[in-house]
A protein has these predicted regions:
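Extended non-catalytic scaffolding segments
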Residues: 547-568
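Ordered core of a single globular domain
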Residues: 402-404, 485-512, 516-522, 574-588, ...
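Transmembrane-helix bundle segments that line or gate the permeation/cavity pathway
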Residues: 2, 23-473, 477-483, 518-544, ...
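Short, Lys/Arg-rich, polar N-terminal cytosolic tail immediately upstream
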Residues: 1-19
Length: 600
């Protein structure tokens, strides 16, 4: 049975909820929460490597939101005029979840330490002496001299009574912030362009939005009292929370047994190709157990099945005598799958995107000529939100290119490739989160490293390698989550509660700026107050590992092998076939998202 081609259908309009307004007092309270959460999360990630914003249902945002809901219920009883509405509660969740990872792996954990490391590890005592600083404009780092207090005190104990050298950061942070904010804006605009298509036409599930929607109650009663009175709810809560609670207590009190929710199968096969199935992950993630109930059967099956298929592929390679380059093979397989998936998303939405382009041209005509010709037979165009987002995408993309060319002095061709890589990976990750609700997920490859592997240091050049890596410390490098996953969920929540996508997007961008400014103060302060050797285990070696990675690309050549290219070909063909079968046969049991998510 042939499925109707999604691209041939016109836009489907769903009646939106009544437009709601958020009071300025609620907005101010939300931004205060943003600043507080960012500062606390930044300190926690540097000193203990506890990432409070991890996951597209951020691990610390959900309990904080639940606490706000309960307090708001009490306020509604005693002073209803001061209570928050349901839309305002959801607004708080949208904004907090959108900035949750800014102070973690998404940006701040890497940016400040790595900027310092580029200078410190260019010193004579390092194996990378003078490898990085000749390529760095002086206004992009606190200092180019490793003996300067702004660099040295970060790695060695600051003299007693000395003032924190925060003033040395003013110029580099002033120069970097427009670029960093532009990266987030670019990610947000691409989500804004596709949100209406995914929500109203393709009707994606957005499983993760169900949690805040249920916790926020209803418009009449913004506190889910029926939920808290449910025995089934509390049984599920205990089953989910108990293993983690015992695990946390065990770390402080070893006499308490450790349930070890993350285990592996150990060695199942001592030798031969089947060793690829050793150390199978046997992880208990209660959040994904719950989310799985909200997924379609083919998505759930694919997320479970494809990890075994991946290991089977490695076993087949070993059986054919190929015992090396498994990681490279799978990585390039993922790169190809991402490209094919992104192309398919554009193809399926081509009719919708044509309408947006027409609306954008009409909007431009209004701006340039102050009038637009109308006829009675004019085809209704989409609301201008998507047109504004498209214009914003073009404007921000151009501004980022200008920054790279005239501020960072990076070649435009490589910058264009880097930013296109961000758009492709961000779009695919947003789709995975919107359709499959995966709790923690980011691309299994780094865009800039793929560029370095494909084109090599001789073609790209040392200066471009150093600066492109530095430009990738926001969004283009995340190893846990990407902002687009948070953004699509927040835009969906804005639609569900009647706030509107454009309003939601505007305040998300404001909140990102607030979070970034707080990070600019928090992270250098914590780094100098503790010094790198006294930070968390991860922070102690982060900048050194980055310096080693860049140094290796500067000093060694990594030519591509047939393993890379065969991985690319097989990945593209497999992803295309899965997409074709999904579009051609209703009920086909395998979903390309399973292939995208688990390979690599």
């Amino acid at each position: 049975m042939k499925a109707q081609n999604a691209a041939a259908a016109s836009l489907v309009t769903i009646s939106a909820p009544t437009v709601q307004k958020v009071l300025w007092s609620a907005i101010a309270f939300t931004l205060l929460l943003v600043a507080t959460f960012t500062a606390a999360s930044g300190w926690s990630s540097l000193t203990r490597y506890e990432i409070m914003g991890t996951g597209y249902l951020p691990r610390s945002v959900v309990p904080l939101f639940l606490l706000i809901v309960l307090i708001n219920a009490g306020i509604r009883v005693f002073s209803p005029s001061f209570a928050l509405s349901r839309s305002e509660l959801l607004f708080i969740f949208e904004i907090l979840s959108s900035i949750a990872a800014v102070s973690g792996q998404e940006f701040a954990n890497h940016f400040y330490l790595n900027l310092l490391g580029l200078v410190y590890y260019s010193s004579p005592q390092s194996q990378w002496f003078n490898a990085f600083t000749p390529h760095l404009p002086p206004y992009l780092v606190p200092s180019l001299n490793f003996r300067d207090p702004a660099i040295l005190w970060a790695y060695e104990v600051m003299p007693e009574g000395a003032r924190l050298p925060l003033s040395e950061w003013l110029v580099p942070l002033f120069v970097w912030t427009p670029y960093l904010l532009g990266i987030y804006a670019l990610s947000l605009f691409i989500c804004l362009i596709f949100s209406r298509q995914w929500e109203e036409h393709e009707r994606l599930l957005y499983p993760l939005t169900q949690v805040p929607m249920e916790l926020s109650g209803s418009d009449e009663r913004p506190c889910p009292t029926f939920l808290f009175r449910s025995l089934l709810f509390w049984l599920g809560f205990i089953a989910a929370a108990l293993p983690y609670a015992l695990r946390a207590l065990h770390l402080y009190f070893p006499s308490i047994p450790d349930p070890q929710p993350q285990r592996n199968s150990g060695v199942l096969f001592p030798s031969g190709p089947l060793t690829a199935f050793n150390n199978l992950e046997l992880h208990y993630y209660p959040e994904m157990v719950g989310i799985a109930y909200l997924l379609s059967s083919e998505v759930g099956l694919s997320l479970w099945l494809f990890p075994f298929i991946r290991r089977g592929e490695v076993a087949a390679r070993m059986a054919m005598g190929m015992d090396m380059y498994h990681a490279e093979f799978l990585t390039f397989q993922s790169v190809a799958a991402y490209l094919v998936m992104a192309a398919s998303l554009l193809w399926v939405a081509r009719g919708y995107l044509k309408e947006i382009l027409a609306a954008t041209l009409r909007l431009l005509a209004k701006v340039v000529t102050f009038f637009a010709k109308r006829t009675e037979n004019s085809v209704p165009l989409p609301a201008p939100t998507e047109a504004k987002a498209l214009l914003g995408t073009i404007a921000v993309f151009a501004a980022l290119l200008a920054w790279a060319k005239w501020v960072a002095n990076v070649d435009l061709s490589w910058t264009i490739m880097l930013l296109l890589g961000l758009l492709i990976t961000g779009l695919v990750v947003a789709r995975v989160v919107a359709e499959a609700g995966v709790y923690i997920y980011s691309p299994p490859f780094r865009v800039y490293q793929v560029m370095f592997d494909v084109f090599g240091k001789n073609r790209i050049g040392a200066r471009n390698i150093v600066l492109l890596t530095a430009m990738s410390w926001a969004q283009l490098r995340s190893t846990a989550t990407m902002a687009t996953g948070y953004f699509v969920n927040s835009l969906k929540l804005g639609s569900l509660c009647g706030l509107g996508r454009l309003t939601t997007a505007t305040w998300i961008l404001v909140a990102v700026l607030v979070a970034m400014i707080v990070c600019h103060v928090t992270f250098p302060t914590v780094i100098y107050s503790y010094s790198v050797p006294k930070l968390s285990w991860w922070a102690q070696t982060s900048s050194l590992n980055t310096a080693n990675l860049i140094g290796q690309y500067l000093t060694t050549s990594r030519p591509l092998t047939p393993h890379h290219w065969w991985g690319f070909i097989i990945g593209a063909a497999t992803c295309w076939l899965l997409i074709k079968l999904r579009l051609s046969f209703v009920g086909f049991p395998l979903h390309p998202i399973g292939f995208i998510t688990w390979f690599g």
